A protein has these predicted regions:
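Helix-to-loop junction immediately C-terminal to a conserved catalytic motif
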Residues: 11
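Conserved ABC transporter NBD signature motif
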Residues: 19-40, 46-54
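Conserved ABC ATPase "signature" region
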Residues: 76, 90-109
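Conserved ABC ATPase signature
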Residues: 113-117, 121
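Hydrophobic anchor residue at the start of the ABC signature
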Residues: 127-128, 155
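Catalytic Walker B motif of ABC-type/P-loop ATPase nucleotide-binding domains
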Residues: 138-142
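Conserved beta-strand-loop-alpha-helix hinge in the C-terminal portion
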Residues: 184-216
Length: 217
């Protein structure tokens, strides 16, 4: 198991060669949870995407900061699946984007190109894109990379607020910070070791991983 492949499997971009990934779904018309898996056919994938929406914040260094797009456009792009390819975003979409921009503390930067943003501002814009569709799950890949410690504290405050409305999977090399912020831990290094709480001792880490590890919380 490698981090990138695992994330793609969770997001439904890859199908696991063995085993399955289950998504717990509760609909408004049926309070009894159902489980969908991503080893499904294309039509079942469509059902999964419609019933279990996911948001994704990619790793910072995968973003092309020269791409000519504004903060507002980045956040609106999180609603692209709610319109056709040729139609425009509606007034409702733009109002939702305005609310997310305010929540991310980006008022006044709506028309600014992403290349002119600080690292923290760009991360907030990308986080806004990930949550604007009200997903059931948000996957965050190294969200604190390239941001200063002051904004890192604010980032985790935002994530705690968002976690009231949806599940979060956070990928990080920063073991110390992750252990303080999350409810459970999965250590990934070819194999995956899951811990239902954050009780991962330094001795356990040294015994089982004699190289840098990645944590999913």
């Amino acid at each position: 198991v490698y981090k990138r492949q695992l994330i793609k499997c969770i997001l439904g971009l890859l199908k696991p060669t063995t085993g399955e990934i289950l998504y717990r779904v509760t609909t408004a018309s049926n309070n009894n949870p159902a489980f969908l898996d991503n080893s499904a056919t294309n039509s079942q994938f469509s059902t999964l995407n419609s019933q279990f929406s996911m948001g994704y914040l990619p790793q910072y260094n995968s973003i092309d900061r020269k791409f000519p797009i504004t903060v507002e456009e980045v956040i609106l792009s999180g609603l692209s699946s709610q319109k056709s390819l040729i139609s425009r975003f509606t007034a409702t979409h733009r109002e939702k984007a305005r609310q997310v921009i305010a929540r991310m503390g980006l008022e006044g930067l709506e028309k600014r190109a992403i290349g002119a943003l600080s690292g923290g501002q760009l991360q907030r814009a990308l986080l806004g894109r990930a949550i604007i569709s009200d997903p059931a799950l948000v996957v965050l890949d190294e969200p604190s990379t390239y941001i200063d410690k002051r904004f890192e504290a604010r980032l985790y405050e935002l994530l705690a607020e968002i976690n009231h409305d949806c599940a979060i999977i956070l990928v990080s090399h920063d073991i110390g910070t992750v252990l303080q912020q999350v409810k459970s831990i999965a250590c990934v290094n070819e194999t995956l070791d899951y811990h239902p709480d954050t009780g991962v001792s330094e001795e356990w880490l040294e015994r089982n991983f004699n190289c840098p590890i990645e944590l999913l919380g």
